[in-house]
């Protein structure tokens, strides 16, 4: 098993051997097993030397046409539709660019689920067969990409990187925050009202509480 093999490899390094951790394609440990071996190496005071190489995540991002200053990588989504949509719903308000891997036999369903959850106009970049002869990278809306997959403008072959535009950040004005807090304060204690207002508006609880105190003194 993984723990036993990790121990064996660590012992071989301690005994003077050199171990290289590689993958079939791309950069090792990016959506691949093996991080426990690296962790064990650090715990045993063994030097870890990374060798830069190609990564589908970074390669696709660099050519995506979407913001690259802030992004999150979520690997493969669940193969089960209900679990997949539930997970996507947790990312509705995520403002960072979203990066996923997807298999060809699930790509159409995944794009359709993303369209249902994020809306048809959210932009997405589909990248497949990266660095290969039939590489294809397409930037469009989720609804347009869905159609292009159906009519095979985007070929459903090879592994896919799916990059989704983050949600637009919206800021709630102080006036709106105070209004929400005032309504809640009619039935709840100041601290409870501030806590709920924080969850509704995204404003920090302490800031809401202080704003309410100042408003009450005017």
Predicted regions and their residues:
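A contiguous loop/helix-start segment that scaffolds small-molecule binding in enzyme catalytic cores
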Residues: 14-18, 97, 104-218
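Conserved RecA-like P-loop NTPase ATPase core
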Residues: 21, 73, 103
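Class I S-adenosyl-L-methionine
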Residues: 1-50
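Class I SAM-dependent methyltransferase SAM-binding "motif I" and its flanking Rossmann-like core
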Residues: 36-94
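Short gly/pro/ser/thr-enriched loop/turn and capping motifs at secondary-structure boundaries
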Residues: 28, 55-58, 132-133
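Helical mechanochemical/support elements of P-loop NTPase systems and associated helical scaffolds
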Residues: 5, 26, 33, 56, ...
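Short hydrophobic/charged patches on amphipathic alpha-helices used for structural packing
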Residues: 7-10, 88-89, 182
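General beta-strand structural signal in soluble alpha/beta enzymes
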Residues: 23, 50-53, 100, 126
């Amino acid at each position: 098993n993984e723990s036993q093999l990790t121990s064996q490899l660590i012992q071989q390094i301690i005994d003077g051997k050199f171990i290289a951790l590689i993958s079939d394609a791309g950069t090792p440990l990016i959506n691949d097993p093996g991080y426990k071996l690296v962790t064990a190496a650090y715990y045993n005071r063994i030097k870890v030397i990374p060798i830069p190489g190609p990564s589908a995540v970074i390669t696709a991002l660099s050519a995506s046409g979407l913001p690259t200053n802030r992004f999150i990588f979520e690997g493969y989504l669940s193969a089960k539709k209900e679990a997949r949509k539930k997970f996507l719903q947790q990312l509705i308000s995520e403002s960072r660019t979203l990066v996923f891997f997807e298999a060809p036999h699930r790509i159409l369903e995944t794009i359709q689920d993303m369209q249902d959850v994020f809306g048809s106009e959210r932009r997405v970049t589909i990248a497949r067969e990266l660095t290969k002869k039939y590489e294809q990278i397409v930037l469009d809306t989720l609804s347009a990409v869905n159609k292009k997959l159906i009519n095979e403008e985007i070929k459903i072959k090879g592994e896919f990187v799916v990059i989704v535009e983050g949600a637009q950040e919206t800021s709630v004005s102080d006036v709106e925050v105070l209004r929400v807090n005032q309504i809640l304060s009619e039935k709840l204690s100041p601290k409870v009202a501030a806590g709920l207002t924080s969850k509704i508006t995204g404003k920090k609880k302490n800031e809401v509480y202080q704003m309410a105190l100042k408003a009450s003194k005017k």
